[in-house]
Amino acid sequence: MPSTPLRTRAVRRAALPAAVLLPLALAACGGSNDGPMWPPANGAYSAACTGLVANAKLAGTTLATSYVPPDSKRPGGAATGAFLPGHCVVTGSINPRVGVDGKNYAIGFQLSLPDNWNGRFLFVGGGGNDGILRDTSLSSSISGGTPSPLGQGFAVVSTDGGHIGTTASFGADPQARIDHAYNSYDKTAVSAKSLIATHYGRKPDRSYFSGCSGGGRQGMVFSQRFPDYFDAITAGAPAMRVSSGATVAAMWNTIAFNAIAPQDASGNRILSQAFSNADLNLVANAVKSSCDAADGVVDGMVSNTKACKFNPAVLQCSGAKAADCLSTAQVGALTKVFAGPRNSAGQALYAGQPWDPGLAAPGWRAWTLGSSTTATPDARYITLMVDALINEFFTPPDLTFNPLAFNFDTDPARMAAYSAIYDTYADDKLTAFRQRGGKLLFIHGMSDPIFSANDTVDYYERLAANNGGIANTQGFARTFLVPGMNHCSGGPATDSFDSIQTMVDWVEKGIAPDTIAAKALPTQVDYPNRTRPLCAYPQFAKYKGTGSVEDAGSFVCSAQ
């Protein structure tokens, strides 16, 4: 399909289709006409913003507001939606308290309320250990280069997950764990909808959620624990099994790579040097040689992922390590990592990774190997995942734990108690969300080094098995895989796409997405400005046989 420009026009409520006017029976997002009229008389937007603190009806919550006048420059001067509409920024703290560790806690949130409200509400998910408030004036958390939802007229909220700071030290406080698992998202969504109703005089007509990584997990929290809150959810690279699976895989991968890494003068391993960039490029090129043509054309992308049966043994040196081959140890480590972690009985503990050329991209190295030239590693498996493991995922926390000594038979059990409230992999029916008419988009990069796309596909296939098959399940949930994309973005991929507009079209116009238009940004190194259709799983983008490989119009979605 041909590329279409992303929408940047602000959409006013008067332009909304009639389908957005929900019956009052849908309490999660139905409108109500009681309260002040909008817009305020004489354009008194700033005064309305100031008055929101006094008019709000939120117990146990402190609020502050500031008004941003129209045509203010966006932070950083980003090209997409560089100038903002007039809007009221609300910062709030829910249930401020002192934790058992003596630290101050509260569920923080930021809500932007545009003057040109289009009747829609968007919750933007967080990520990592959270602990910061995402700027609600920026693009959605799932794809860079897309229009600012605030600029389009959405009321937009974000939360810090119930603590301040990006480390997982909050894990010492039991309530902070609960807040980060699910409670902060519930409280933020309820508070935001109440403030929207107070400010505009009616509730949102439609409510949407968009998040990636931890934000994708948060989206799944809503689909399972609070299924009436959102009409549609985008769960990008969802961390559905972060504590019970992906973190186990991160330890497995780190141990495998560290074991073959060269040593410094003191005998300490230098993790980043287990594979050079040239080594990873060698592997990526071999993956392309083996699998690229299966989608009908050699274009540097492996779109027919199910047909890719790459074996790194083809790269093994017959003798000493050389530039055009891998050592026996390197082949063994790659084989182990891509197969996924197992215990001593051979039981799989998490999905393996798909073979994809994106493994040579900086985003893959940043998570798995890092770039430190010393024995102090900087891979995100260590700096982020180990921090979460020892502080939050283990019950009780174990601050002296050595990740290189992770026991794959016994240590997963230490994570089970928290996984029960944190992970979102067990509910593979989503009955309540489906019955209320909710729509769900999974979007996942094929070269995500932390949350395997295979794990998302496995969940989706179980979801389909419990809902009458793929065709029936596509009535409310669809999965889109992005060849080459690393974790949420990056890699040799068409990683810019507008999932929010896709949700809006599905919910408000009844247009179920068979494809999502995607493009590579002009600054992308590998394939600048390339366009592709992202195809609803199990289909993939297949070359038609003619036309430029840079143009989405040369491809069609196919299951074989």
What is the predicted role of each segment?
Residues 24-28:
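C-terminal motif of bacterial Sec signal peptides marking the signal peptidase cleavage site
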Residues 31-120, 133-136, 143-144, 284, ...:
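Catalytic-loop region of hydrolases
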Residues 126-204, 247-248, 397-422, 481-486:
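Cap/lid segment of the alpha/beta-hydrolase catalytic domain
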Residues 202-213:
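Alpha/beta-hydrolase fold nucleophile elbow
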Residues 221-223, 228-344, 481:
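A catalytic-pocket lid/entrance helix-loop region that shapes and gates access to the active site
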Residues 442-444:
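Short beta-strand/loop motif that positions the catalytic acidic residue
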Residues 475-490, 521-523:
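Histidine-bearing beta->alpha loop at or near hydrolase active sites
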